[in-house]
């Protein structure tokens, strides 16, 4: 188990809270884009604006749940505590943004768009399967984005494009990001087992999708070792 001092745990939690704040700000910009532009162009611009959050998280090495799940294959059982702690802190950061927005001039506009977005998903007849599968697709794209910061430079590719493009795609497609969803649910104002179930399924979906690429990379490394 990786030993962490009390100070390191506090820093970990603070960086996770700031990651939630970054996602909340990016999500807010995305909602405003959808509200004022609508259609495909609004979604594309919204995805680009949402990518600000992920780009900031990678640049400042913040702790985001959907980014940390990629480390699950090598994390070890005794370090798994970081995942729920990270998610809770991410959710606190997103909630802080939502509270601040309540006192801003764009509150009504953001709330209407957030309720429209998450309300439609929540009340679908296939909401459970949608949350799981949509969350998995989002998890795949988030891992691609975060890993691009490590792999792209080695291949002579643009790190910025590699980080931003998967985020634009997932936001454009409307895939479920469990942390961003927490802000949308805050504005929805509904507390029920239905909501809890949706949140949990999107978390599981993000985790499943997030570990797929790392597992394939590990398998590729194993196969390379066998061929030596």
Regions found by a protein language model. Name each.
Residues 1-228:
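Alpha-helical transmembrane segments and their helix-helix packing motifs
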